[in-house]
């Protein structure tokens, strides 16, 4: 995609944000566990339910951006500040998608697993659109990039470590708040779905990326 076509880039990247946000909402609805990066906002929302998942999401992203400033110092570029509007947009999109699915009833484990698998596919497509748009960048991914550059450890290793950190912190908070590592009992944030999303989203992208790229070439 041509870098000089800013409108198209932002449209594609924004479409990616919408799809990823819908994936977050689907994973929460499945009640089998959400993606590692969404675990802290989801757990905090269970304890402080007056504050939405989306609000906790953008708050977490702002903290991640501040951590980048600390790590990079003067090397922190002004262009990185575009993560701030991306954080707000993504947070409110998460809330909107959660609201859209509020009346959906999931009563069987089979249906829960179907939603989990659908979340993997949807998230893979959304992430590819974000990357293809080369406009918005969410703080989770950018923080992993910065950590990789600063530590000189591979991005994949850093990403896995960051995911594990998010899950562990969320599980510890859940244990302290609810006496359970997975959630408040009725609402599950960390379970097999978390592992499925962590392991298989990247693998799914190997299949969906060529299809998304082919579609983008036709449309754009």
What are these regions (language model features)?
Residues 2-220:
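Core subunits and conserved enzymes of cellular information-processing
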